[in-house]
Amino acid sequence: MMTAIGMMSGTSLDGVDVALIETDGERVTAFGPTGYRPYTNDERGLLREALAEAVNLTRRDARPGVIGMAEHAVTMAHSDAVTSFLARNGIRREDIDIVGFHGQTVLHRPGERLTVQIGDADALAKAIRVPVMHDFRAADVAAGGQGAPFVPAYHRALAQSLGRDGPICVVNIGGVSNVTYIDGADTLIACDTGPGNALLDDFMLRTTGEPFDRDGRLAQQGRPDADWIASALNHPFFALPPPKSLDRNDFASLALPDRPPADGAATLTAFTAAAIARIVPLLPKAPERWIVAGGGARNPIMLEMLREKVAPAPVERADALGWSIDAMEAQAFGYLAARGLKGLPLSYPATTGVPVPMTGGVVTRP
């Protein structure tokens, strides 16, 4: 059994989630404490600049200009996150077997076999004095896979604790939304479904100065533009069968016409819910249960809109099952780090489109 810490900095650019689990790489035997280290406004601004610059990258190891500055900021933020986490919870470094370090995705173009996560694992391992596993996605993309989503193996481990007969979907609504379809047998299908919070968060920042729509309050006051949503759902991505994946900026060109902020928030919230529901006809069977994690799970308006789209199947928050809403992806990368140490698969043909089940990750020691 291993004690693993996972860290995740997602496409929402909000901060670093930290989580400890006990696992053998197959089962999760215990959930440990979780933590969160928000990015400062300066760090978040630097990451947004890096995202804009990264569209010009052609090599995954290139770190020109602001991207190199952002990599240093990401590394230091993760070092601070794990050091504070250990101190706050009275955990000794020597009791940690592995730290799973995802880094910050700034570019994801699997069609070009290119995925770029910034973060210096060597510097991090030296700073925290614990072995670090990183570069989880590279082997999958190099082999022709989508390189995402990577959390399905962890979703399946969690689902082992559920008494279920029919298929379920576990949804993570982060900057990008993704689903994992798990049936009563061994079928595991996963894919990105479309924008999660990214378009909405960007809209909120641009129109209100707020980083996100807390509790869906603004969207609740507005009216969704059904015509705009129907047009947006004509994007060819939505007709593709799984597996498929997205870059955070793939839908950035979708422009809302001028409208009151409340209507814009309502439209983008409804679009996220509708995009998730569009996966149902592409699955072997309609899911009988939906379990939602990620920042979107804290938006009751988004959940209500999703319920309307997938009825009569129930939609519930992950924390109703004792799972973590905010730290699930961090837990997943601790779990994946343990799997990587044992050479177990991290991705599968039906989750990323990789030709064969693939292990991955690179270990850096202090």
Swiss-Prot record:
Belongs to the anhydro-N-acetylmuramic acid kinase family. InterPro entries: Anhydro_N_Ac-Mur_kinase, ATPase_NBD. Pfam families: AnmK. It comes from Nitrobacter winogradskyi (strain ATCC 25391 / DSM 10237 / CIP 104748 / NCIMB 11846 / Nb-255). GO terms for molecular function: ATP binding; kinase activity; phosphotransferase activity, alcohol group as acceptor. Pathway: Amino-sugar metabolism; 1,6-anhydro-N-acetylmuramate degradation; Cell wall biogenesis; peptidoglycan recycling. It catalyses: 1,6-anhydro-N-acetyl-beta-muramate + ATP + H2O = N-acetyl-D-muramate 6-phosphate + ADP + H(+). ATP binds at G10, T11, S12, L13, D14, G15, V16, D17. This is Anhydro-N-acetylmuramic acid kinase. Keywords: ATP-binding, Carbohydrate metabolism, Kinase, Nucleotide-binding, Transferase. One of its GO terms (biological process) is 1,6-anhydro-N-acetyl-beta-muramic acid catabolic process. Catalyzes the specific phosphorylation of 1,6-anhydro-N-acetylmuramic acid (anhMurNAc) with the simultaneous cleavage of the 1,6-anhydro ring, generating MurNAc-6-P. Is required for the utilization of anhMurNAc either imported from the medium or derived from its own cell wall murein, and thus plays a role in cell wall recycling. Its EC number is 2.7.1.170.
